Amino acid sequence: MLEGQIIKALSGFYYVFSEGKIYQCRARGNFRKRNISPLVGDDVEFQVENKTDGYILDVLSRENALVRPPVANIDIAILVFSAVEPDFSTNLADRFLVAIEKEDIQPVICISKMDLATDAEKEQIAVYKEVYETIGYDVFVTNDEPDKEAIKDYISGKTAVIAGQSGVGKSTLLNSLNSDLTLKTAEISNSLGRGKHTTRHVELMPIGDGFVADTPGFSSIEWDDLQPETLQFCFPEMEDRRSGCKFRGCMHDNEPNCAVKTAVEANEIADFRYKHYIQILQELKNRKPRY
């Protein structure tokens, strides 16, 4: 019996990487009865039938798992946003960050297409970059060679997911990190301002000593399992100040003597970050319950 990691799931087969080899495996027949559904990224125990095929016997415990994309055991999330085409959006960036923070996955922000931006756009993005770095996020510009090497170092020995709108340059970034990938890239559709989807399934691809999951592009994020009272924990600069609020259950909205609102007024917390927090908070409060 061997242990390995699922790097691709396609047409009922699971492709398991173990000791430098890839095995095409099927899941045991009793998995469905046991309500076990293997995911890309899962660590598994499997039995080899021949040099290339085998059966998955068990799925080992998961550190975490995303629903969309369906990937397990993620160490870091590389969030790619373009400077232009489509334009950089702090609203979208913060929503992606919340989606990743709530899963306790370390996010890394990458900004692509900076070479296509005007001087004014570059100046504005530099301001946003400083805000996110002050919070504690690492921000890289994918056009810069030193930053590409830093991204490779981040991925080394880890499983990462790369996410962002379609058309922002995720596949281009992966191709630049590993020239053997030759992933398809897409231009932006002029009518919708969105990229054509070029990634059809989730697959872990080797980048140095690590793996990265390229995932279908998406521009909307759902908060099905996020509660209003836990949203503040997805904003690190707010979580750091919550102990200074007068009320223990302060949600930093209409409550008096709120340390977070005081920090916003003192420009210690970026106004746009607080604005997005309130927007998402209201969405969560107004969400219709699902039965």
Swiss-Prot record:
<dbReference type="InterPro" id="IPR012340">
    <property type="entry name" value="NA-bd_OB-fold"/>
</dbReference>
<feature type="binding site">
    <location>
        <position position="245"/>
    </location>
    <ligand>
        <name>Zn(2+)</name>
    </ligand>
</feature>
<feature type="domain" description="CP-type G">
    <location>
        <begin position="63"/>
        <end position="221"/>
    </location>
</feature>
<feature type="binding site">
    <location>
        <position position="250"/>
    </location>
    <ligand>
        <name>Zn(2+)</name>
    </ligand>
</feature>
<keyword id="KW-0378">Hydrolase</keyword>
<dbReference type="GO" id="GO:0005525">
    <property type="term" value="F:GTP binding"/>
</dbReference>
<keyword id="KW-0963">Cytoplasm</keyword>
<keyword id="KW-0694">RNA-binding</keyword>
<feature type="binding site">
    <location>
        <position position="258"/>
    </location>
    <ligand>
        <name>Zn(2+)</name>
    </ligand>
</feature>
<dbReference type="InterPro" id="IPR031944">
    <property type="entry name" value="RsgA_N"/>
</dbReference>
<keyword id="KW-0547">Nucleotide-binding</keyword>
<comment type="subunit">
    <text>Monomer. Associates with 30S ribosomal subunit, binds 16S rRNA.</text>
</comment>
<dbReference type="GO" id="GO:0042274">
    <property type="term" value="P:ribosomal small subunit biogenesis"/>
</dbReference>
<keyword id="KW-0479">Metal-binding</keyword>
<keyword id="KW-0690">Ribosome biogenesis</keyword>
<protein>
    <recommendedName>
        <fullName>Small ribosomal subunit biogenesis GTPase RsgA 2</fullName>
        <ecNumber>3.6.1.-</ecNumber>
    </recommendedName>
</protein>
<dbReference type="GO" id="GO:0003924">
    <property type="term" value="F:GTPase activity"/>
</dbReference>
<dbReference type="InterPro" id="IPR027417">
    <property type="entry name" value="P-loop_NTPase"/>
</dbReference>
<keyword id="KW-0862">Zinc</keyword>
<comment type="similarity">
    <text>Belongs to the TRAFAC class YlqF/YawG GTPase family. RsgA subfamily.</text>
</comment>
<feature type="binding site">
    <location>
        <position position="252"/>
    </location>
    <ligand>
        <name>Zn(2+)</name>
    </ligand>
</feature>
<feature type="binding site">
    <location>
        <begin position="164"/>
        <end position="172"/>
    </location>
    <ligand>
        <name>GTP</name>
    </ligand>
</feature>
<dbReference type="GO" id="GO:0046872">
    <property type="term" value="F:metal ion binding"/>
</dbReference>
<keyword id="KW-0699">rRNA-binding</keyword>
<comment type="function">
    <text>One of several proteins that assist in the late maturation steps of the functional core of the 30S ribosomal subunit. Helps release RbfA from mature subunits. May play a role in the assembly of ribosomal proteins into the subunit. Circularly permuted GTPase that catalyzes slow GTP hydrolysis, GTPase activity is stimulated by the 30S ribosomal subunit.</text>
</comment>
<feature type="binding site">
    <location>
        <begin position="112"/>
        <end position="115"/>
    </location>
    <ligand>
        <name>GTP</name>
    </ligand>
</feature>
<dbReference type="GO" id="GO:0005737">
    <property type="term" value="C:cytoplasm"/>
</dbReference>
<dbReference type="GO" id="GO:0019843">
    <property type="term" value="F:rRNA binding"/>
</dbReference>
<dbReference type="Pfam" id="PF03193">
    <property type="entry name" value="RsgA_GTPase"/>
</dbReference>
<dbReference type="InterPro" id="IPR010914">
    <property type="entry name" value="RsgA_GTPase_dom"/>
</dbReference>
<dbReference type="Pfam" id="PF16745">
    <property type="entry name" value="RsgA_N"/>
</dbReference>
<dbReference type="InterPro" id="IPR004881">
    <property type="entry name" value="Ribosome_biogen_GTPase_RsgA"/>
</dbReference>
<keyword id="KW-0342">GTP-binding</keyword>
<dbReference type="InterPro" id="IPR030378">
    <property type="entry name" value="G_CP_dom"/>
</dbReference>
